[in-house]
């Protein structure tokens, strides 16, 4: 049960971060006075995940959650 709570908290935390990143991108685009195309949105999501290095982050999280370090 405790592991489930950790996982849910982690998912909530990562969701909050991704929402804040999207909001920052949207605010930056509103300053330009133009709307982003669908392709630009997809491209920004891909670059954000590459920059965040999610696979390494997931390995560290799993290591700490399951004490396999």
UniProtKB/Swiss-Prot annotation:
Pfam families: FSAP_sig_propep. The keyword Cell membrane does not apply. Keywords: Amphibian defense peptide, Antibiotic, Antimicrobial, Cleavage on pair of basic residues, Cytolysis, Disulfide bond, Hemolysis, Secreted, Signal. Its main location: secreted. Disulfide bonds join 63-69. It is found in: Secreted. One of its GO terms (biological process) is defense response to bacterium. Expressed by the skin glands. It comes from the Eukaryota. InterPro entries: Frog_antimicrobial_propeptide. GO terms for cellular component: extracellular region. Residues 1-22 form the signal peptide. Residues 23-43 form a propeptide. Belongs to the frog skin active peptide (FSAP) family. Pleurain subfamily. Antimicrobial peptide. Has activity against Gram-positive and -negative bacteria, and fungi. Has little hemolytic activity on red blood cells. This is Pleurain-A4. It comes from Nidirana pleuraden (Yunnan pond frog).
